[in-house]
Amino acid sequence: MAAKIKSGDLVKVIRGKDRGKEGTVKQVLKDDRLIVEGVQIVKKHVRATQQGQQAGIVAVEAPIHRSNVMVIDPETKQPTRVRIVEKEEARDGKVKTVRVRVAKKSGKELA
C-alpha cells in the first residue's frame, strides 16, 4: 500500500494532548508512527558524552501514531483525508501508470 502521509507534509493533530496543533512531518517511522515538528514534546534526560555534549534535560519530539493526524489540504487549509489515484503519464515515449496522492476535499494533487 502506498504511503498516504510522507515527510514534509503539513498535518494537524486530531487526537491526544496536542489536539489542534499543526506541524510538518519530520520523519515517518516503520511502525505507523510519525515525528511531527513541535508536537508531542517530551523531556529526555541525557548523559554527558566524551565529544563535549553536556548532561541535562532536553526537550525532544516523541512519535505520534498516524491515525491521530490528518493531512492539511493545501487549497482549503483544512484537514482532509488522502486518496491514492492512478493516472497515466507519458514518459520517454511510453505510457506509464503512476500513483498520485490526492486531497479528498478539494481533489487537488498533494506534492
Curated annotation (Swiss-Prot):
<dbReference type="Pfam" id="PF17136">
    <property type="entry name" value="ribosomal_L24"/>
</dbReference>
<dbReference type="GO" id="GO:1990904">
    <property type="term" value="C:ribonucleoprotein complex"/>
</dbReference>
<dbReference type="InterPro" id="IPR041988">
    <property type="entry name" value="Ribosomal_uL24_KOW"/>
</dbReference>
<dbReference type="GO" id="GO:0006412">
    <property type="term" value="P:translation"/>
</dbReference>
<keyword id="KW-0694">RNA-binding</keyword>
<dbReference type="InterPro" id="IPR014722">
    <property type="entry name" value="Rib_uL2_dom2"/>
</dbReference>
<dbReference type="InterPro" id="IPR005825">
    <property type="entry name" value="Ribosomal_uL24_CS"/>
</dbReference>
<comment type="function">
    <text>One of the proteins that surrounds the polypeptide exit tunnel on the outside of the subunit.</text>
</comment>
<comment type="subunit">
    <text>Part of the 50S ribosomal subunit.</text>
</comment>
<keyword id="KW-0687">Ribonucleoprotein</keyword>
<dbReference type="GO" id="GO:0003735">
    <property type="term" value="F:structural constituent of ribosome"/>
</dbReference>
<dbReference type="InterPro" id="IPR008991">
    <property type="entry name" value="Translation_prot_SH3-like_sf"/>
</dbReference>
<dbReference type="InterPro" id="IPR003256">
    <property type="entry name" value="Ribosomal_uL24"/>
</dbReference>
<comment type="similarity">
    <text>Belongs to the universal ribosomal protein uL24 family.</text>
</comment>
<protein>
    <recommendedName>
        <fullName>Large ribosomal subunit protein uL24</fullName>
    </recommendedName>
</protein>
<keyword id="KW-0689">Ribosomal protein</keyword>
<dbReference type="Pfam" id="PF00467">
    <property type="entry name" value="KOW"/>
</dbReference>
<dbReference type="GO" id="GO:0019843">
    <property type="term" value="F:rRNA binding"/>
</dbReference>
<comment type="function">
    <text>One of two assembly initiator proteins, it binds directly to the 5'-end of the 23S rRNA, where it nucleates assembly of the 50S subunit.</text>
</comment>
<keyword id="KW-0699">rRNA-binding</keyword>
<dbReference type="GO" id="GO:0005840">
    <property type="term" value="C:ribosome"/>
</dbReference>
<dbReference type="InterPro" id="IPR005824">
    <property type="entry name" value="KOW"/>
</dbReference>
